[in-house]
A protein has these predicted regions:
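Boundary/entry segment of secreted carbohydrate-active catalytic domains
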Residues: 62-118
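Cleavable C-terminal sorting propeptides in eukaryotic secreted/cell-surface proteins
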Residues: 434-464
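Active-site region of glycoside hydrolase catalytic domains
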Residues: 133, 163-338, 357, 365-388, ...
């Protein structure tokens, strides 16, 4: 197997120069490589102690089997993410409310190895933006709710923010969108609500004045609870108490060409009423579907029904039909408290895997079948410092050490499946294009597997 130079860089990041030297020797033909250096007494003693703690040879065998399982999980996750992100509609939320996350440079390497090409932050962390320079990954960065009133009151505040958080990083880092506030209209801070649109306008003007040479969209993320009604989707409508805020925001989106962002979690609906919400309907699993009497359309999953309810609400509020909807957050927790039914790794794998299959296939909603759904999955890592119920700390696809929380199957058993991103992204084009896709995917998977192998070795043997 050809080992890309990036693999050595990745290994060096995690384990140091000695590990790179050892790997270089291990992949040489035996006739070319030097003989294996003797293992010192201290390392031998340390290894014997580890074997004793694990129960001798049986324990070592258990470690090997555990390592094989983790590598299998890593392979499935890598294939899933590479396959989906190749369609340019898959993004991931990179939250950092944790004390055990890897350095941004390591995250950049990890996401590149998985083929993720869109990332959404909840701030404008300079370490992250610097680490992702020249990677080609598109970033959505954020203005915090605490800054809205200052920006609404003074255009200079918005200019200073752009000068500090955007200009130093472009064009090396691709910043494609700025979200101004998060779920502001769902709170009770009327001053922040009144400041939201003026702050959005100020940031948009500041970006234009900065002369960046590239378009940067301005939007704000809203919870789906800004809707007064969401089912049937055709009856979607915004809450009356928010109408005075929402209509001008929709006009802003129509004027600037930016999307309306919505955070939508079918898990919350299922958690609130497990007896009234079909779990297969929430998880994109086979189910009879639900017919919308207003349009005659049938919905086989809750997320797409929620998206179409937002479209209907926008139309009812006088919004233009050309304003798009982006799902800025969605996901499913792998763990929860006793009063959080459905929060399991199995359900999380089903939700995210089935969603990614549809995204990779370019599937639209029943109301807008020709418009692929733009999605940011929540989240990249489990975040151990998030407040609230256990589920809040367990939305991650990955543990902080980079190992998968669960096996994620965004593909399928073969090319016959209608929503099979592995075959869609790799084999649906011409033969020459497919060959390029296979080479690209193989390299990405190798890098991802290498990272996982490093993590496993560090856990098991402390060689690095």
């Amino acid at each position: 197997m050809h080992v890309n130079a990036s693999a050595f860089i990745l290994l060096k990041i995690c384990c140091g120069d000695g590990a790179v030297t050892g790997m270089e020797q291990s992949i040489k033909p035996r006739s070319e490589g030097a003989s294996r250096p003797p293992v010192g007494p201290e390392r031998q003693n340390r290894q014997r102690r580890k074997e004793k703690d694990m129960g001798g040879e049986a324990g070592m065998g258990l470690r090997v089997r555990a390592s094989s399982l983790l590598l299998s999980l890593a392979l499935q996750l890598a294939v899933a993410l590479v396959s989906v992100s190749a369609q340019h509609k898959f993004g991931i939320n990179y939250g950092q409310i944790a004390n055990d996350l890897p350095e941004p440079a390591q995250v950049a390497t990890l996401l590149q190895s998985m083929g993720v090409n869109k990332v959404k932050l909840y701030d404008a962390d300079p370490r992250v933006l610097t680490a992702f320079a020249s990677t080609g990954v598109g970033f959505t960065i954020a203005v915090g709710n605490e800054d809205l009133q200052a920006m609404a009151a003074s255009p200079d505040a918005a200019r200073r923010w752009v000068a500090a958080n955007v200009q130093p990083y472009v064009p090396a880092t691709r910043i494609t969108c700025v979200t101004v506030g998060n779920e502001v209209l769902s709170g009770n801070d009327t001053a922040a609500m009144a400041s939201l649109l003026p702050a959005m306008r100020a940031v948009h003007a500041a970006l234009g004045d900065a002369g960046l040479g590239q378009p940067v969209a301005v939007s704000s993320a809203h919870s789906v609870d800004v809707l007064a009604t969401s089912f049937p989707p055709s009856s979607g409508a915004f809450r009356e108490d928010l109408a005075g805020y929402v209509r001008p925001i929709l006009d802003f989106h129509a004027q600037t060409g930016s999307p309306f962002l919505v955070n939508a979690y079918p898990f919350f609906s299922y958690k609130a009423s497990p007896g009234g919400v079909s779990l297969p309907y929430a998880l994109f699993q086979p189910n009879p579907g639900v017919r919308d009497p207003g349009t005659g359309l049938t919905y086989d999953n809750m997320l797409y029904a929620q998206v179409d309810a937002v479209y209907a609400a926008m139309q009812a509020a006088g919004g233009r039909a050309d304003v798009g909807v982006t799902v800025s957050e969605t996901g499913w927790p792998s763990r929860g408290d006793d009063d959080e039914p459905g929060a399991t790794a199995q359900n999380a794998a089903a939700y995210n895997g089935n969603l990614m299959r549809r995204v990779a296939a370019g599937q639209g909603t029943p109301l807008r079948p020709a418009v692929p759904v733009d999605v940011y999955v929540f989240a990249l890592f489990n975040e151990d410092l998030k407040p609230g119920p256990t589920s809040e700390r367990n939305y991650g696809l990955l543990y902080p050490d980079g190992s998968p929380v669960y096996a994620l199957d965004a593909g399928g058993p073969g090319p016959g499946g209608s929503l099979n991103p592995y075959y869609t992204s790799m084999f649906s084009s011409s033969s020459s294009g497919s060959a390029v896709g296979v080479t690209f995917l193989t390299e990405k998977v190798v890098l991802s597997l290498l990272l996982q192998a490093i993590v496993i070795l560090r856990r098991s043997y402390s060689y690095c």
